[in-house]
From Swiss-Prot:
It comes from Shewanella frigidimarina (strain NCIMB 400). It is an enzyme of class 2 (transferase). This is tRNA U34 carboxymethyltransferase. It comes from the Bacteria. The keyword tRNA processing applies. Belongs to the class I-like SAM-binding methyltransferase superfamily. CmoB family. Pfam families: Methyltransf_9 (PF08003). GO terms for biological process: tRNA wobble uridine modification. GO terms for molecular function: methyltransferase activity; transferase activity, transferring alkyl or aryl (other than methyl) groups. It catalyses: carboxy-S-adenosyl-L-methionine + 5-hydroxyuridine(34) in tRNA = 5-carboxymethoxyuridine(34) in tRNA + S-adenosyl-L-homocysteine + H(+).
Amino acid sequence: MINFSSFYKDIADSNLQHWLETLPAILGKWQRDHKHGNLPKWEKVLNKLHYPQPDNIDFSSSVTIGTGEQLSPGQVEKLTNLLEVFQPWRKGPFSVHGIQIDTEWRSDWKWDRVKNFISPLKNRTVLDVGCGSGYHMWRMLGDGATRVVGIDPSPLFLCQFEAIKRVAGNQHPVYLLPLGIEELPPLDAFDTVFSMGVLYHRRSPIDHLLQLRDQLRVGGELVLETLVIDGDENAVLVPQDRYGKMNNVWFIPSVAALMLWLKKCEFIDIRCVDIDITSLAEQRSTHWMKNESLVDYLDPNDVSLTVEGYPAPKRAIIIATKNQPNHDLV
């Protein structure tokens, strides 16, 4: 069974120690609630991932574990088969003992867009909200973060993350907790909080921004990446039904509207540092993710539109700083 004792030990003497008052009970309930379904099968696969300490690890320019020279061809084939059990792999890519996990998303491209605008992560404690299988968490560690905590409620993402961590040696201060942000108390402790690809999935985007603020220390940095539309501060797209075949997209604001929301939530130093239209090369089907992807979500006659007729995905990166909060804002 996946356990979180190493995380509890790691934060026991940190500014996150007060989280231990509630976290073990919450994760214990999660474990009890997931005794059935696919999780037991995936955990059996995780228990087979016993490999030597990698001869090379690179988290600064990629997520590369091992050169591919330590394992025999038979061992590589076995490891490939084990990792394929965790399909679909959506966020990556990963290189594991020479095995190239070509994921649906080129998450490294997003990181390249983000990394040059954020405050240096060296010696920072970082929270990644909606972290998926953890690709960006490894890159955050590679950029010098002291501790990286990711939250995402998906059992599959947890197992994908655990697979990578175990093959990497299992000693790195990177942790994925199967939680939604609404399950976190106001920790007021993280130096940097990332929320990338989450806001438009939230029924209440203002509440999400407040939840993100509550995890930051005063002066901490929010890195927010989300879908946007063109328009002024009053422009917000609310899809009538689906957006890009997704039925869980609620609000897509303009950059101006999003910056106004952040100001309303008492962030300061708010700035948009990048706007990028998602390309068919950045999100696509692969051997490791064989389901539909971006090309299937766009109008075949006009890729500037989704199949529903909405503007095609455009993503903005907004950076802001937590101000001293006004406790009258709820």
